[in-house]
């Protein structure tokens, strides 16, 4: 029973956000540009669905001569579903603000800080960058509920990545470690803790002449042994996921993005499917 609860809590309240596949995480853009986006995504596992509407803001800045960016994501989520555990019916019904995410990344090599006019002559070769993300436990959470859209714990996620340009192609490789604090108000007055999850992801991105792009995505992650009051439960995670992302520019300021991914292998049977769409608007930086 406890393993079942931990599995659902972890995959639907934590894993989807922490292990998101993100193409073009390390790329260059003109200094001073702002991006605002809104979107909707749905993760499903068995009879359970987590639908998330999110708004985000990103700003590009000069980081010691290289470009950097800072992003804030505000998600709102609805968790629904019904399942069986023996003769017991397990209902999921939770809705509200999910945990906000803040992320900063700095390019260390190959992405000079350029204004809009200078950027028109920029040609990418090799970019190397670093990032740090954190999830803030402000989401809807009740220790009396089995499942929640908030995790009631922090995570921080340092990462490193590289992007190599070959003609119209971009080949990316990135790695990260997701480190969790404990949830001291888990169901029944228990304490839930988890070891770090280590992940790597890779992308092959093709750019079309109109700047639309299509990415084939893959990620592998492992670790994340869970503990209930210090006792190991649930087993160590090991997962492969594959997906695709397509971005299309409507005009110089607006674009849409469609994405999807699916679990190809899961050591502990905690795979899920994810689909979503978002709209992005950009301004500033002399546009």
Can you name each region flagged by the protein language model?
Residues 17-39, 110-124, 284-287:
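Outer-membrane beta-barrel biogenesis signature
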Residues 38-40, 55-59, 102-108, 132, ...:
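Residues on the lipid-exposed face of transmembrane beta-strands in outer-membrane beta-barrel proteins
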Residues 78-193, 235:
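Outer-membrane pore/translocation modules
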Residues 190-287:
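Outer membrane beta-barrel transmembrane domains
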Residues 36-42, 70-78, 128-136, 173-179, ...:
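Transmembrane beta-barrel strands of outer-membrane/channel proteins
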Residues 31-37, 65-73, 99-101, 119-131, ...:
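Outer-membrane beta-barrel architecture
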Residues 32-34, 47-55, 95-102, 126, ...:
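Residues that define the transmembrane beta-barrel architecture of outer-membrane proteins
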Residues 31, 43, 62-66, 109-111, ...:
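Outer-membrane beta-barrel channels and translocator barrels
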């Amino acid at each position: 029973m406890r393993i079942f609860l931990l599995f659902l809590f972890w995959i639907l309240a934590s894993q989807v956000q922490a292990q998101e596949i993100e193409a073009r995480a390390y790329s260059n853009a003109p200094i001073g540009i702002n991006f605002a986006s809104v979107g909707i995504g749905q993760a499903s596992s068995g009879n359970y669905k987590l639908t998330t509407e999110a708004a985000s803001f990103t700003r590009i800045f000069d980081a010691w001569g290289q470009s950097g960016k800072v992003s804030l994501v505000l998600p709102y989520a609805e968790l629904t579903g019904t399942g069986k555990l023996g003769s017991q019916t397990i209902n999921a019904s939770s809705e509200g603000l999910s945990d906000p995410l803040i992320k900063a990344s700095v390019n260390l090599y190959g992405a000079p800080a350029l204004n809009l006019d200078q950027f028109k002559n920029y040609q990418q070769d090799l970019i190397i960058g670093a990032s740090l993300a954190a999830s803030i436990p402000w989401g809807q959470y009740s220790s009396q509920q089995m499942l929640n859209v908030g995790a009631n714990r922090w995570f921080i996620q340092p990462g490193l990545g590289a992007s190599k340009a070959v003609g119209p192609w971009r080949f990316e490789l990135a790695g990260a470690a997701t480190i969790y604090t404990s949830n001291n108000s888990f169901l029944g007055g228990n304490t839930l803790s988890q070891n770090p999850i280590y992940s790597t992801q890779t992308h092959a991105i093709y750019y079309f002449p109109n700047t639309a792009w299509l990415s084939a995505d893959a990620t592998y992650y492992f670790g994340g042994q869970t503990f209930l009051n210090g006792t190991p439960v649930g087993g160590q995670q090991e997962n492969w996921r594959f997906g695709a992302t397509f971005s299309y520019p409507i005009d110089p300021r607006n674009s849409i993005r469609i994405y999807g991914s699916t679990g190809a292998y899961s050591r502990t049977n905690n795979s899920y499917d994810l689909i979503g769409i978002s709209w992005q608007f950009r301004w500033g930086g002399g546009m």
